[in-house]
């Protein structure tokens, strides 16, 4: 057990071959294709998959000429689903498409059938979204989440570059970190447990799997300072994981929302991101809330921060904005809330402009659909840019 002044916290991740993540990636690949040709596309694209089948369905209004079947097959192929024995054959599986136009009732309420100015655009739905930041890592993200996510990305890297040729696309990771509470801030002490369950071919032994995962996945990802002789490793603890991908489990868009965000830290309003254009505040509201929380922590105003924003369908102004710094703020939270409101425009149309969220192409949203939407060093992740905050510092 951890000492009394410390505690254990666990985050998990799945890599791009997990069936739910496959669906997220297909949905966001469709969104990218729509926005690349028509930045005003309205997209709500869901994907589901099971053995030998992928289906895309939802509501899309776009001037883009989108070949849905081609996008599905390309996305699955790029993940590594190239034959039935790895879980799905991208070139021969069934692809079903059931796409309709956006409801005219929603269209008139949100964007007035494209007649409203940006500042007048209403939220695409009701809901509440959260952004979170913490000073425990350079990314200003929780360490347990960062490590679980990077282990998953590394699994894919060593599969695709041939370092571990026995790997197959599906896989899950989980990291338990021992933390110390420092007046509300979270200070990582050590990694308590590392769990990796990865799909593999028939040829490899469990001993080889464990040795390769330690050498080629865990060692390059987890800093040495966090590992000690007491760290526990569970490497493919079920003993066999040959059947995977959609053959092993059904998949659905929007089933991995905690993996997409903060690994269980902070809070979540419940709305998924993938397959949604930026008028959907589930996505754009969460992105600007992350930028606000990150900017507060990066500025030194707090060591830890959560921001909540809420909306009503068709209404531009948020219903509420909330800030909590968990007792780590240098100034009172009500002052930090004032700074957030003065520096960030939470109206959906203005979020879209300020974060350039209509820009498709370059696989922009597809990139977000695996290995997390936050804490990534990529110019397409505009919400990760720290905004210099304007505020009146109280006189000494």
Curated annotation (Swiss-Prot):
Alphabetized Pfam families for the sequence: S-AdoMet_synt_C, S-AdoMet_synt_M, S-AdoMet_synt_N
EC number: 2.5.1.6
Binding site for K(+): 46
Chain positions recorded as ATP binding sites: 18, 170-172, 238-241, 249, 255-256, 272, 276, 280
One GO term (biological process): one-carbon metabolic process
Annotated Mg(2+) binding sites: 12
CDD domains recorded: S-AdoMet_synt
Coiled-coil intervals: none
Cellular compartment(s): Cytoplasm
Cofactor(s), names only, from the UniProt record: Mn(2+); Mg(2+); Co(2+); K(+)
Keywords carried by this UniProt record: ATP-binding, Cobalt, Cytoplasm, Magnesium, Metal-binding, Nucleotide-binding, One-carbon metabolism, Potassium, Transferase
Assembly and oligomerization: Homotetramer.
Sequence similarity: Belongs to the AdoMet synthase family.
This protein's name: S-adenosylmethionine synthase 1
Species in which this protein is naturally found: Oryza sativa subsp. indica (Rice)
